[in-house]
Amino acid sequence: MKNIFVVLILLFTLALKAQNKIYQPEREKINNLVHTKLKVDFNFAKSQLNGEAWITLTPHFYPTNKVTLDAKAFKINEVKVNNIIAAYNYSDNELTIELNKTYSKGEEYTVYVNYIARPEEVTQKGSENIKEAKGLYFIDPLEEDPEKPTQIWTQGETEASSCWFPTIDAPNQKTSQEIFMTVPSKFVTLSNGTLQSQIENNNGTRTDYWKMDQKHAPYLFFIGAGEFSVVNDTWNGKKVDYYVEPEYE
């Protein structure tokens, strides 16, 4: 009887703990992402990203005449909808844009945002497992530490990609992507999808174009750049590349 009483107390305690857990529903869908195109380059002196974003969306169900994008610690320079200057409000890390008309479900529109991302000014906190949530990380950007390689890379889980590009930063959104990334010519880049082209510029930089047609959540967007060596391998007939620092090649 005593054992039964102890078990009942334990079950009651577990039930109370379960009730105290915060229910986290998925974000309400008002607009759906369709495609995201980005052009980015980097201000190493300030650890900032200069960006242009073309975001194609469509209403989820009900007609709408506005869209709200997550954009954390940005400086917004210009906003357009379908190539027309648009009114907007930027506050509390959200960019709310007035559309040029009311759009219905299935009707697409494209928002253009010219911006500066400032990850060092992001105030949001990370999770228990991922302590920081800056989204974009500059490693020794001024090349001051001979023991550290200069690198740029991102970590978007779960809602930190909006620290470096405007988006609906929710795991229940899906979008295809294109990224044009301009970096010092000595850098190797990596992103989602496949490398489509590389163009050498006349100022010591190179622009790499990465494209991924398969739709995925915004937190899975990735860019990386640094002085990497690429080690080629295969597995079960599939190409596998390893991006490593040169001394580990």
Which stretches of residues belong to each language-model region?
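Acidic/His-enriched low-complexity segments
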Residues: 18-249
